[in-house]
Amino acid sequence: MRCIALAQAFVAKGVQVAFACSKQDGVIHVKSVGFDAIDLCSLSDRDQIAAISSQYRSDTLSLIIADSYEFSASYLEGLNNIAPTAYIDDLHTPELNISAIVNGNITADSSFYSKRYEQSSARLLIGPKYNILRSEFYGQKSIQIKDRVKRVLVTSGGSDPHGASIRITETLLECEPLYNAEIVVMAGPLSNSVSQLQSISANHPSVTVLQNASNVAELMRSCDMAIAAAGGTMNELCACGVPSVVYALANNQVRAAFSFSNKRCALDGGAVWDTDFSSRIKNCTEELAHSRDLRFIISNNANALFDGAGANRVATELLALATSADRSRV
């Protein structure tokens, strides 16, 4: 999703963009939104490098952006030998021989990158100001904070492997300040919880289940608060200034949930595998729903940290690295 958002930012600057995908679902998705894609699914790493080099000679390719946990240091260096390469790094990978590192996460440690890349000429784009969000989140202001919470959003991102959205929805139905509120569950395209959520909705008219929702920013802004996993959706909620309770769906989200809470951008509802997960979600939800002042503070902090302009900033910075004089192809 963030690669699509970044590609759209490049297109807005008059740059031609194409994709090279090593997963079949990636090829399908990229083509569905109107971009060309090279299918690398059946190729080894070495053959992938050769295919990219053959398809886009160095005199026609200005820049490469790589985004996958599976890329090795040698693979990224091979890409960098074709054209200046930027790596979107979530894992604080040390000492890559490439042209730029992008880490726009709330957990991004600028001091780590400064130390580990001290001897490198790589451009470092670190911190939430470089978080890549879809264009619909650009320039959003914080939502109006009402005296009472009337609409709550529940989301677990693209999937729901632990059935977190089910447990959270059942918990919210027991929260006293939400007795008269609408609960909107935004199920991701890979969620296996939809049928159970629809059963809950059938018995509780206050619960609405949406899957593959369009205009997500508008949906978020229609809600007074949210319960969200500590992934990309949480960054989008911050850009809209929606006060939230954040939770971890996976080990790599625990630190992010803590960081959102530590920066007073959300309340930390714990991890889905915690034995007290439901009670923590209930306590945090009631605390946030009861206090307009707390919601106001969290809303402003979140919106200030994620302003939705990260994709444009990253595109601008990376174009400065482009080798071709016209900087026309990424």
Residue ranges and their predicted role:
Residues Q140-K141, K146-C223:
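Donor-nucleotide binding loops and adjacent catalytic segments primarily
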Residues D276-D293:
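C-terminal "capping" alpha-helix adjacent to the active site of nucleotide-linked donor transferases
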Residues R221-D224, C238-Y247:
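Conserved donor-binding/catalytic loop of nucleotide-activated donor transferases
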